[in-house]
Amino acid sequence: MFDSVFKDIRYELTRGNTLTKIILINCAVFIALLLAKIIITTVNGGDSNIYYLFTNWITLPTSFGQLMYQPWSLFTYSFVHEGLLHILFNMLLLYWFGAIAGDLIGDRRIFPIYFYGAFFGGLF
């Protein structure tokens, strides 16, 4: 059963459109962070401070001064989602509006728009 799911995911990553790849990458990062949170919290006896230190390192800081010390967060924050509803609605909206944008401007331009949107959204 899981073998066919992994085959479908592998197929979409190799031959799917850009929008599907972005959604799958976001979901993979969400699952990886969720597993990391579970493992770190379990190993540390319920203390998840190390997890929050890591997520603070990859999420967008609130002050511009702190952004100068972690400029990579302008790119990584767009892949970090904290809750199930957060990622669900973000990916639904990305799928719906991304499909419309892909039809209008072409599939090749979806990733640059996502990338620049995340970058400038983080700046402003």
Task: State each model region's role.
Residues 1-18:
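C-terminal transmembrane module of polytopic alpha-helical membrane proteins
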